[in-house]
């Protein structure tokens, strides 16, 4: 099958060609290995940048006949990742049994990257000479990513290159969500919104949902990356983005974003997002409002309630019947403070209705901001 010219780039990934029923029945006497779990980590923020060493731990399950003298080797199909330790002498795996190497995983290193969010393919090959058996599996690894993971205190979250937090896009392609300790993510979507009302025209620049799918107003200028700490923080990152590629909602902004997190006692349960906004358009902006949109899912989303503590300048969401777990956003600046809780029901209980035909429109977003 791989002798065909246009199949060569897919070598090892297309199966074995035409269905051979006789061979399929004979294969019942063969082992049948599958990767049932794996862990990629650098034991830090799991952002694999140039020069970083990371590990790959694999769990294998054998569904059919026992396999003996099993050897496993991983190889990188890209010159951007080097295999530091890629051999695992497994031995035998009986029928309906599993083995893993999480305590002694494979070791890899990122040696180079030509671009951000570069995909690297690592091939795992398992073979047994006594069983005349070979199994291959391919791992896709994102190196030099265009986002940062914050993982230095009880909060685990991700900040993107273009104004989102929790995940890097609406589809949750990459990201930790927003987790507290060992709890699952409490956030479905989160991002920065900047709006203004000038000359009877309302504009809001953002990257969150809209009536079609999501807005694409912010684009990276300097891709966010982790930096050396400047004070007593445990994590610091910096990046910038603009709205110059927006269509109807281009305002003319450059936004510098900073991310800080601390692990000192009493400061383990929050992350700081700081935005410095510059107007480089040729006009003064009036009615400017800046805020964070967050679709919280605390424990049971169907029981979520929202409230505001004006004295503390924060809005928060909690789940009825659950104690202790509360998601909060607090404004740290001295600017005018405002919160808006959107009712997650058809009609919006008379407020902003994100379920109508137009969805979460620019006017809805500006209403929520102001």
Task: Please describe what each predicted stretch is.
Residues 1-53:
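C-terminal subdomain of the subtilisin-like protease fold in secreted/lumenal serine endopeptidases
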Residues 59-64, 76, 110, 277-281:
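Asparagine-centered strand-capping/turn motif at beta-strand->loop junctions
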Residues 61-81, 86, 288-297:
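Short acidic, flexible loop segments centered on an aromatic residue
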Residues 82-114:
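Intrinsically disordered, low-complexity Pro/Gly/Ser/Thr-rich segments with frequent PxxP/GP/PP motifs
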Residues 102-149:
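Terminal connector regions
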Residues 141-226:
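Solvent-exposed N-terminal domain segments of exported/luminal and surface proteins
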Residues 198-274:
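Extended, loop-rich substrate-binding clefts of extracytoplasmic carbohydrate-active enzymes
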Residues 286-370:
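Glycine-rich (often Gly-Gly/Gly-Pro-rich) flexible segments and glycine-rich loop motifs
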């Amino acid at each position: 099958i791989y002798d065909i010219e246009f199949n060569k780039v897919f070598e090892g990934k297309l199966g074995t060609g035409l269905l051979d029923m006789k061979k399929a029945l004979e294969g019942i006497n063969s082992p049948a290995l599958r990767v049932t779990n794996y862990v990629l980590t650098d034991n830090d923020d799991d952002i694999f940048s140039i020069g970083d060493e990371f590990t790959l731990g694999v769990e294998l399950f054998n569904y059919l006949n026992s396999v003996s003298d099993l050897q496993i080797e991983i190889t990188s199909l890209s010159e951007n990742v080097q295999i530091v330790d890629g051999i695992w002498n497994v031995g035998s795996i009986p029928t309906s049994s599993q083995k893993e190497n999480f305590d002694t995983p494979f070791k890899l290193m990122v040696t180079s990257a030509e671009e951000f969010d570069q995909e690297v393919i690592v091939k795992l090959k398992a073979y047994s000479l006594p069983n005349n058996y070979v199994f291959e599996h391919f791992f896709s690894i994102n190196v030099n990513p265009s986002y940062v993971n914050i993982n230095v205190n009880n909060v685990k979250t991700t900040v993107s290159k273009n104004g989102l937090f929790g995940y890097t896009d609406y589809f949750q392609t990459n990201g930790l969500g927003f987790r507290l300790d060992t709890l699952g993510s409490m956030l479905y979507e989160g991002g920065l919104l900047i709006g203004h009302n000038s000359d009877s025209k309302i504009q809001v620049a953002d990257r969150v949902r809209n009536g079609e799918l999501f807005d694409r107003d912010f684009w990276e200028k300097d891709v966010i990356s982790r930096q050396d700490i400047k004070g007593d923080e445990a994590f610091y990152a910096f990046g910038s983005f603009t709205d110059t590629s927006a269509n109807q909602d281009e305002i003319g902004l450059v936004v510098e974003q900073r991310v800080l997190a601390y692990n000192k006692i009493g400061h383990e349960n929050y992350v700081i997002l700081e935005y410095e906004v510059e107007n480089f358009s040729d006009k003064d902006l009036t009615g400017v409002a800046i805020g964070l949109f967050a679709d919280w899912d605390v424990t049971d989303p169907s029981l979520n309630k929202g409230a505001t503590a004006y004295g503390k300048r924060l809005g928060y969401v909690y789940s009825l019947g659950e104690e202790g777990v509360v998601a909060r956003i607090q404004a740290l600046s001295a600017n005018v403070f405002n919160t808006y809780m959107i009712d997650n029901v058809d009609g919006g209980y008379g407020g902003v209705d994100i379920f109508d035909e137009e969805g979460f429109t620019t006017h809805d977003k500006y209403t929520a901001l102001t």
